[in-house]
């Protein structure tokens, strides 16, 4: 990955609210399935905005920090996804998205961020990201003290 796109908490909340508006009316949804771990925070934000209390998870491991590796399903929500929003933070190459589509063919699959290779696999997303860009999510970063340049 040659570029980095840094996401702040404020940016993430704003993008999640945009996505929530597109998912109205809220009463059409039975619940939300968060793709762990990237979809956990966006799922919480959507659940709040849409007033949805039924939140489940599907746990798929496909990344090790910045390296993709073999996909492994650790836990899945029951059913075919009918009436559910499935959310992940991003769709990249589409590997996870393809697995989600197979597991939940009737779900409405959304992400906050989408790269070109994965865009056709989601029903909706908010932000276009170039394929060669790494997304730094706010939950992966920490605020640290930086000493003044002048030394005081």
From Swiss-Prot:
It is an enzyme of class 2 (transferase). GO terms for biological process: GMP salvage; IMP salvage; purine ribonucleoside salvage; XMP salvage. GMP binds at residues 69, 92-96, 134-135. It catalyses: GMP + diphosphate = guanine + 5-phospho-alpha-D-ribose 1-diphosphate; XMP + diphosphate = xanthine + 5-phospho-alpha-D-ribose 1-diphosphate; IMP + diphosphate = hypoxanthine + 5-phospho-alpha-D-ribose 1-diphosphate. Its cofactor is Mg(2+). Guanine binds at residues 92, 135. Xanthine binds at residues 92, 135. CDD domains: PRTases_typeI (cd06223). Coiled coil: none annotated. Its EC number is 2.4.2.-, 2.4.2.22. Transmembrane segments: none annotated. It is a peripheral membrane protein. It is found in: Cell inner membrane. One of its GO terms (cellular component) is cytosol. 5-phospho-alpha-D-ribose 1-diphosphate binds at residues 37-38, 69, 88-96. Mg(2+) binds at residue 89. One of its GO terms (molecular function) is xanthine phosphoribosyltransferase activity. Keywords: Cell inner membrane, Cell membrane, Glycosyltransferase, Magnesium, Membrane, Metal-binding, Purine salvage, Transferase. Belongs to the purine/pyrimidine phosphoribosyltransferase family. XGPT subfamily. Purine salvage pathway enzyme that catalyzes the transfer of the ribosyl-5-phosphate group from 5-phospho-alpha-D-ribose 1-diphosphate (PRPP) to the N9 position of the 6-oxopurines guanine and xanthine to form the corresponding ribonucleotides GMP (guanosine 5'-monophosphate) and XMP (xanthosine 5'-monophosphate), with the release of PPi. To a lesser extent, also acts on hypoxanthine. This is Xanthine-guanine phosphoribosyltransferase.
